[in-house]
C-alpha cells in the first residue's frame, strides 16, 4: 500500500507512540497536541519531553495545536485522548474531518 497522510489527535504517551509507528511505516503524520509550545518543541527536537523523554521520534511527524492543520488531507485519524476529553475534542474536529477519512478511537474508558 502506498503512503498517505495519517493524523493522530492527542499528544500523550500513547498518541506519541502511535504517531511514531505510523511515521516509521512511511506515512506523513499530522500530530495534534493541545500545547503549541510542546508542538514546536517536538518539531524542533523530535522528542516529546513531557511523556517520552529521550525517545527519538521520526521526522515525518509534524506536530501542531491547530486541529484543521492536523487533520487536513488525512485518510486515517487516530483519536488518542482521555475519555473525559473525547467528546469535546471530536466535536472540535468535526468541521475539519475529510469526508472519506476513517476515524479510529484508541480512547480507553467511557465518558
Name every feature range the model reports, one short phrase each.
Residues 1-53, 62-65, 92:
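NAD(P)+-binding Rossmann beta1-loop-alpha1 motif at the extreme N-terminus of oxidoreductases
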Amino acid at each position: 500500500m502506498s503512503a498517505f497522510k495519517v493524523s493522530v489527535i492527542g499528544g500523550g504517551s500513547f498518541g506519541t507512540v502511535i504517531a511514531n509507528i505510523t511515521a516509521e511505516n512511511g506515512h506523513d503524520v499530522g500530530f495534534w497536541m493541545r500545547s503549541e509550545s510542546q508542538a514546536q518543541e517536538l518539531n524542533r527536537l523530535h522528542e516529546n519531553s513531557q511523556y517520552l523523554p529521550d525517545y527519538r521520534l521520526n521526522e515525518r511527524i509534524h506536530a501542531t495545536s491547530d486541529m484543521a492543520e492536523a487533520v487536513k488531507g488525512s485518510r486515517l485519524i487516530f483519536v488518542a485522548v482521555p475519555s473525559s476529553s473525547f467528546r469535546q475534542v471530536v466535536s472540535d474536529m468535526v468541521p475539519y474531518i475529510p469526508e472519506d477519512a476513517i476515524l479510529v478511537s484508541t480512547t480507553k474508558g467511557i465518558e
